């Protein structure tokens, strides 16, 4: 079995990238919702109903994406912490068994 090397700093950086993407997506969501709200008074009839339904579907999908990005970021943070902790624990166990 091949050894797996991890770098907690790299994992933290990648988690931050997911957080950045999530933040950018939230900004886009806000812009789309703002535009939709501004146009709501002018959207009447079937076209208005269809446009509002499309905006609702967009919001649902975008919110799901934000949730997924946040979960990925949290999982990466947790993994980095666990890898570091496990590495330190194993190093301590090895040092103890070798009386170092």
UniProtKB/Swiss-Prot annotation:
Region (Disordered): 80-100
Keywords noted in UniProt: Secreted
Record InterPro entries: ESAT-6-like_sf, T7SS_ESAT-6-like
Cellular localization per UniProt: Secreted
Protein role: An exported protein. Plays a role in DNA conjugation, in at least a donor strain.
Subunit structure: Forms a tight 1:1 complex with EsxA. An artificial EsxA-EsxB heterodimer interacts with EspA.
More details: To improve expression in E.coli the proteins were cloned as a single protein in the (non-native) order esxA-esxB with a cleavable thrombin tag. DNA conjugation in M.smegmatis is unidirectional with distinct donor and recipient strains; mc(2)155 is a donor strain while MKD8 is a recipient strain. Mutations in a donor strain that alter DNA transfer do not always alter DNA transfer in a recipient strain.
Protein name: ESAT-6-like protein EsxB
Source organism of this protein record: Mycolicibacterium smegmatis (strain ATCC 700084 / mc(2)155)
């Amino acid at each position: 079995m091949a050894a797996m090397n991890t770098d907690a700093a790299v994992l933290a950086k990648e988690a931050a990238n997911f957080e950045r993407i999530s933040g950018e997506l939230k900004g886009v969501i806000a812009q789309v919702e703002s535009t939709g709200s501004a146009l709501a008074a002018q959207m009447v009839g079937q076209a208005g109903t269809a446009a509002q339904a499309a905006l609702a579907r967009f919001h649902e999908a975008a919110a799901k994406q934000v949730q997924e990005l946040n979960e990925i970021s949290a999982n990466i943070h947790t993994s980095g912490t666990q890898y570091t902790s496990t590495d330190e624990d194993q190093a301590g166990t090895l040092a103890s068994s070798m009386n170092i």
